[in-house]
Amino acid sequence: YETDAQGKETMLTVKEKKIAAEIEKEEIQEEELAGEAIAENTKELPKPVKKSLYMILLSIFFWFAAYNAVTTAFSRYAVKVWGLEGGGFADCLMVATVAAIFSYIPIGMISEKFGRKKCIQGGLLLLLISYLSAAFFPVYHPAINIGFILIGIGWASISVNSLPMIVEICSLGDVGKYTGVYYTFSMAAQIFTPIFSGFLMQHISYRVLFPYACVFTILAMITMCMVKHGDSKPQAKKKVWEHFDVED
């Protein structure tokens, strides 16, 4: 009830059936739009896009095979080849890790300007130069740490941009599936490479380690050149700390 200025009470009524019908109509329209969006986003990828997806997945396998071989076998390599004792090898790995941490934000900014693919290719080039340089050191020298700084920067360039490229290539409805494929290839490489590289070092020489990493890095560079999709430049961040956001 509502009371007017003269003190009279008036009964207010609500057209419930009309409102209910409008609500039901809106819900049906929303469901139809959602269905159309799902159908659009779960369409099969075109062949050229699929090829790019397969090539970047192979690249992921190759660069993880190279990088993981170095990180898992470096302690033994440093002792057997360079004669480092007392855990001195840990300093090199620490240098690479710190370099990567300090590189993430600048690399995000570089990706905004030049694109993800070029940033990944630059990272692979840094890794190749570093692995190749390390292979020519007969004994440990402090200059080796420069190579490990480049390894950290190169690996950061790859890790910042690779998963976003997968997400960019796949359709919205398949993001979860292709993210799973990304981790399948990366983990498969990390299972394969310690076994295979370990076998080669045991039966040939520990000096095989860095040439081994070079070969797989070159393979990653070749397959990455065949990736033609997923290279849109990420949107520029308004704040510096937004570069820490993870896109998956």
Q: Where on the chain are the PLM-derived regions?
A:
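Juxtamembrane intracellular "pre-TM" segments in multi-pass secondary transporters
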Residues: 1-57, 239-248
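Short amphipathic helix-loop junctions that connect adjacent transmembrane helices
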Residues: 72-88
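Loop-to-transmembrane helix entry/capping segments in MFS-fold secondary transporters
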Residues: 86-87, 170-182
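Helix-to-loop junctions at the C-terminal end of transmembrane segments
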Residues: 103-116, 201
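C-terminal ends and interior cores of transmembrane alpha-helices
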Residues: 125-139
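Hydrophobic core of transmembrane alpha-helices in multi-pass small-molecule transporters
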Residues: 143-157
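Intracellular juxtamembrane helix-capping segments at the cytosolic ends
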Residues: 157-171
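A membrane-interface helix-boundary motif in multi-pass transporters
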Residues: 199-217
